[in-house]
């Protein structure tokens, strides 16, 4: 059973749910108010400890440590350098788990890694060499701790099960911490995730996590809020089970997460040689939550998230019973969004069963020691077969892999036909094991967004991914690719004890925290480029709509693809050539044209006839304008852009290509909106986007004044090619004083330069 409460709840002694303060007082003997009880959540206490101001409604946070991987750290360090950073003021972990296998671009990936090593020496960072660990496994093992906060430039920065509130954000927010500034954010609501019962044999963390995603994503129940895991069911989940659920909270669009801690949490830290990192965390005797998700773990079934989102969930038995109908419905819904090649799922149902072509167990969600051992228990003595189906396994860290070799589980998997791979995040973001054209992959990874597995629809390629737990993937492998729920097999799960070998990191990881070498030289490869100059916001703004996307949600993978293009993230100009390339291939040319026009304007050259006709139409409609002194840029419209990755490049690539704004009905995540702001793009909100369309111009007079004065709403004007001018209201939503100035200055780097 999974139930969403319509209203807030009071939790008494961490176990009893009450609907009102009177009931809570009766059960607890404590009289309180909603406002006072809200201070009883674990989240409130951690946020208060990290808040640098006395205002708990408008937070100004500093974090205990930060972390980035090799497709984000170059841009962050470059931004911080340009903003005046001299050394890292807090521990900063730089991992190399994304561009560590692909040979795209020759030396450029390894050039980035060597840049990071040199930065760790110069500024005092922590450098984790290639394939030693994925980013989140390493931070769980070495950095998380009770009551701490960690900021990461990866959306799946989540260590709540270890008592750490972790937040994934775009690079600009990390750069702020590196120059001694704060993370400014209105205090989020807190939602109780109340667990009871115990999962059946064969049920794994992805079954629980996907069930939650399916229940809360579309209705926005936890959007930009904190998910606080409580209830008696928590004690029935091993720590790695909790970790693997926790990392998937990102897919609900929540802001962060936190769990109660217990003896199992304490043992985790003892095993990893850090007993001091443990802290007992629990809600106060009476705590108020703004909502509640009630989950009976006894009732969770083997679950699958069909293409193209982790929330598109069915039980495996439900899919099996209605295979032809569900496969066809998913296929047709996907093909409404996809441009180019089409998805084929109809052919995956034959001989009375659903058949898949590939299985992947990988990374921070799937590649935990417990998950891989469970897969080994299922596959021991069996065979994946010599047909189309393949199975690859990517452990989360080298210590986990070493223990899998030592206890024989890796041998069990290899003997069954699985391939043991490096500690690499590739299958999660399109840089590893892209299926063949037309194939259907099942993966214990974090996401199955359109083409995130690496296919290129513009080149006639289309493959598809569903998410499943490692146990059901192993069960499917044991049946040669025939979709199988792990609960349908009779398996004796051995649950072997884990032994952590810290010496593997001690031998290879460079820990320069507190040992900065200011005279050390940064090592630049030929692909590592500085950020280009960004113009400040002029008083008026003219933008051309260069992409108009009507999908319900637009992901960051669509805004800037991952996979092989990630190798160019150290080169802003080159990477920007891929902006929207899989979703709207013509966007790049349209936006580039507007960038060229703006550069000509800045140089004092005449504006092209098309733009002058726009100004003539505005003048005719009585709208004052000043063409010579008005910034000209591009923009996109999307109903709800920014679901998914924290990658700042989803915004920066638009900006480099000449974008000055986004228009949306709402923004999918706080982190994407923050990325737009930090790169100087005004995040407009519009209620009636039908007033403009692709190719129209939008003129926003006095935009600089409106932003700086924090006006709630102001006018914009849509100008069509025939000269029709339509006035419509726009707003920016809430902006902090710093955010308003960042937009006015043109980007975060300009803001810091202007304030040095």
Question: Which residues does each predicted region cover?
Answer:
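Fe-S-dependent hydro-lyases/dehydratases of central metabolism
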Residues: 1-756
């Amino acid at each position: 059973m999974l139930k969403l409460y319509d209203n807030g709840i009071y939790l008494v002694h961490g176990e009893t749910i009450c609907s009102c303060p009177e009931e809570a007082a009766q059960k607890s003997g404590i009289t309180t108010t909603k406002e006072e009880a809200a201070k009883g959540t674990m989240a409130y206490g951690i946020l208060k400890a990290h808040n640098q101001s006395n205002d708990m409604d408008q937070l100004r946070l500093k974090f205990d440590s930060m972390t980035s991987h090799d497709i984000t750290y170059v841009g962050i360090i470059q931004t911080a350098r340009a903003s005046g950073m001299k050394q890292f003021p807090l521990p900063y972990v730089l991992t190399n788990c994304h561009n560590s296998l692909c040979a795209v671009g020759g030396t450029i990936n390894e050039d980035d890694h060597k840049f990071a090593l040199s930065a760790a020496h110069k500024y005092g960072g922590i450098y984790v060499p290639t394939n030693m660990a994925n980013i989140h496994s390493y931070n769980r093992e070495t950095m998380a701790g009770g009551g701490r906060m960690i900021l990461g430039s990866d959306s799946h920065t989540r260590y709540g099960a270890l008592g750490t509130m972790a937040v994934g954000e775009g690079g600009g927010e990390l750069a702020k911490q590196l120059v001694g500034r704060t993370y400014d954010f209105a205090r989020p609501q807190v939602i109780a995730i109340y667990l009871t019962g115990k999962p059946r044999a064969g049920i794994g963390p992805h079954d629980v996590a996907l069930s939650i995603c399916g229940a809360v994503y579309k209705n926005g129940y936890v959007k930009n809020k904190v998910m606080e895991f409580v209830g008696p069911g928590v004690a029935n989940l091993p720590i790695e089970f909790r970790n693997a659920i926790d990392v998937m909270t990102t897919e609900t669009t929540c802001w962060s997460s936190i769990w109660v801690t217990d003896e199992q949490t304490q043992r985790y830290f003892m095993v990893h040689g850090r007993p001091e990192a443990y802290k007992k965390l629990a809600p106060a005797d009476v705590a108020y939550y703004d909502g509640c998700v009630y989950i009976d773990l006894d009732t969770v079934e083997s679950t699958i998230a069909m293409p193209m989102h982790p929330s598109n969930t069915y039980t495996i038995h439900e899919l099996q019973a209605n295979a032809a109908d569900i496969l066809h419905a998913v296929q047709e819904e996907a093909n409404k969004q996809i441009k180019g090649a089409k998805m084929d799922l109809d052919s995956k149902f034959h001989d009375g069963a659903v058949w898949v072509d590939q299985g992947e167990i990988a990374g921070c969600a799937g590649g935990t020691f417990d998950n891989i051992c469970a897969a080994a228990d299922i596959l021991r003595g069996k065979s994946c077969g010599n047909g189309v189906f393949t199975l690859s396994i990517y452990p989360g860290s080298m210590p986990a892999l070493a223990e899998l070799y030592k206890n024989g589980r890796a041998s069990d998997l290899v003997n069954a036909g699985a391939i043991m791979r490096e500690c690499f995040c590739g299958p999660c973001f399109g840089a590893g094991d892209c299926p063949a054209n037309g194939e259907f992959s099942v993966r214990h990874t974090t996401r199955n967004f359109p083409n995130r597995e690496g296919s290129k629809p513009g080149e006639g390629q289309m493959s598809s991914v569903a998410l499943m737990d490692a146990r059901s993937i192993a069960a499917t492998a044991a049946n040669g690719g025939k979709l199988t729920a792990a609960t349908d097999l009779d398996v004796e799960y051995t649950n072997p004890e884990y032994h952590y070998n810290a010496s593997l990191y001690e031998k290879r990881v460079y820990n320069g925290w507190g040992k900065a070498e200011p005279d050390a030289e940064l090592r630049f490869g030929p692909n590592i480029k500085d950020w280009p100059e960004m113009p400040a916001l002029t008083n008026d703004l003219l933008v051309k709509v260069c992409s108009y996307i009507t999908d319900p949600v637009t992901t960051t993978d669509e805004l800037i693809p991952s996979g092989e293009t990630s190798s160019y993230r150290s080169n802003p100009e080159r990477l920007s050539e891929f902006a929207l390339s899989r979703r709207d291939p013509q966007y790049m040319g349209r936006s580039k044209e507007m960038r060229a026009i703006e550069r000509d304007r800045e140089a004092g050259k005449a504006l092209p006839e098309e733009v002058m006709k726009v100004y003539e139409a505005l003048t005719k409609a009585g709208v004052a304008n000043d063409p010579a002194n008005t910034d000209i840029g591009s923009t996109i419209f999307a109903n709800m852009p920014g679901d998914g990755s924290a990658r700042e490049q989803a915004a920066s690539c638009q900006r480099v290509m000449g974008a000055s704004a986004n228009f949306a009905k709402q923004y999918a995540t706080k982190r994407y909106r923050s990325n737009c702001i930090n790169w100087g793009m005004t995040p407009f909100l519009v209620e009636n986007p039908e007033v403009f369309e692709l190719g129209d111009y939008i003129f926003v007079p006095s935009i600089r004044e409106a932003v700086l004065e924090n006006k709630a709403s102001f006018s914009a004007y849509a100008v069509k090619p025939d000269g029709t001018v339509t006035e419509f209201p726009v707003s920016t939503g809430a902006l902090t004083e710093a955010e308003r100035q960042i937009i006015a200055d043109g980007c975060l780097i300009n803001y810091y330069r202007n304030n040095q």
